[in-house]
Amino acid sequence: MRTLVALCLGLAATACGADMIEAFGLKWRVPIASDWKLETAEGIPALSLLVPRPSTEPRRPTQFALAETPDFLNVTLEAEMKQEPAALRNRHNSLMIAYAWKDANHFNYAHLSVDSAEEQKVHNGIFQVNGGDRVRISPEKGPASLTHEGWHTVKLVYDGVTGKVEVWVDGKTSPSLTAVDKRSGAGKAGIGSFFDLGQFRKVKITGQRAR
């Protein structure tokens, strides 16, 4: 038992038990632990999503790491993120941040894409999963978020009291990355992608529980 505990403490992003990984001082719940790997990107620890898995029906993201924190009513998630290079699979790539997660059928997420919502209505915006397919809850107006293939500085701020969520990418936000929904309430936050590869580093989650 002591040997197992020591091994778990030493393996930062290797599963210690089913579908759990560790990175950035947190434990994360994932569908398949071997799809993720803690690597070093430019001398900085980075969590890499190595396997793009297609979305199942109903249509919503499943390939994301969910932080094992309390259910936060107010939460801020900050990170540097890097999308899959377009040339790798000739795709229009994206990343996502989950928030107000209650279970696999009830959560919200911010979708950050190389194209705008005006180009593709189910890209680059705020979405809600409520037992079925994801539904857009933000306007479609605004530019693409992932405008280059380097590291992006990303910040999501969610206030469960007012229902407002806003996302900044490289210091900029837009109507498509802002939404208000008072039904969402408290939940957990996570990082990942719909069905693309990606890297995440300098991830920090702070929040406040519901009183």
Q: What do the predicted segments below correspond to?
A:
Residues 39-63:
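Short carbohydrate-recognition loop motifs
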Residues 57-128:
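Secretory/extracellular carbohydrate-interaction modules
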Residues 181-211:
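Ligand-recognition surfaces built from glycine- and aromatic
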Residues 18-42:
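Extracellular carbohydrate-recognition regions
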Residues 63-70, 139-146, 189-190:
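Beta-strand-rich interaction surfaces with strong enrichment in secreted/lumenal proteins
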Residues 79, 150-160, 165-167:
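Short tryptophan-centered beta-strand motifs in secreted/extracellular beta-sheet-rich domains
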Residues 130-153:
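Short, aromatic/His-centered strand-loop micro-motif at the edge of beta-sheets
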